[in-house]
Amino acid sequence: MQSRVLLVTALLVLLASARATEGEDPSLLGLMHGYVQHATKTAQDTLTTVREFPVAQQARDWVTGRFTSLKDYWSTLTGKFSGFWDSTFAVTPTPASEAK
């Protein structure tokens, strides 16, 4: 919810500043250049603010913990069944008469 509010606020600030700078540079290229620079700065500021939220840090920690847990589970599972897979897929030589 808070990230949506920040995004909407950033877009409103961006639109307001674009209107404020319209009178300064009459060329369309200059307007677009200023708009893109301001949009980039606003997006970077918003992302930095969102990254600093405790909820974002908790989400990153949760995902990291779940991924680590999944890797541990997978290694345990493959460790238990590795002997089974090795013996099942052992290559046995075929006699020459059956190979043709």
Swiss-Prot record:
Function, as annotated: Component of triglyceride-rich very low density lipoproteins (VLDL) and high density lipoproteins (HDL) in plasma. Plays a multifaceted role in triglyceride homeostasis. Intracellularly, promotes hepatic very low density lipoprotein 1 (VLDL1) assembly and secretion; extracellularly, attenuates hydrolysis and clearance of triglyceride-rich lipoproteins (TRLs). Impairs the lipolysis of TRLs by inhibiting lipoprotein lipase and the hepatic uptake of TRLs by remnant receptors.
Annotated organism of origin: Acinonyx jubatus
Region (Lipid-binding): 68-100
Keyword terms of this UniProt record: Chylomicron, Glycoprotein, Lipid degradation, Lipid metabolism, Lipid transport, Secreted, Sialic acid, Signal, Transport, VLDL
Site (May interact with the LDL receptor): 41
UniProt cross-references to InterPro entries, sorted A to Z: Apo-CIII, Apo_CIII_sf
Cleavable signal peptide: 1-20
Record PTM: The most abundant glycoforms are characterized by an O-linked disaccharide galactose linked to N-acetylgalactosamine (Gal-GalNAc), further modified with up to 3 sialic acid residues. Less abundant glycoforms are characterized by more complex and fucosylated glycan moieties. O-glycosylated on Thr-94 with a core 1 or possibly core 8 glycan.
Similarity comment: Belongs to the apolipoprotein C3 family.
GO MF terms held by the record: high-density lipoprotein particle receptor binding; lipase inhibitor activity; phospholipid binding
Alphabetical GO biological process terms: cholesterol homeostasis; lipid catabolic process; lipid transport; lipoprotein metabolic process; negative regulation of high-density lipoprotein particle clearance; negative regulation of low-density lipoprotein particle clearance; negative regulation of triglyceride catabolic process; negative regulation of very-low-density lipoprotein particle clearance
Lipid metabolism in keyword set: yes
Primary localization: secreted
Location(s), subcellular: Secreted
Protein name, entry field: Apolipoprotein C-III
A Gene Ontology cellular-component term: chylomicron
Glycosylation sites: 94
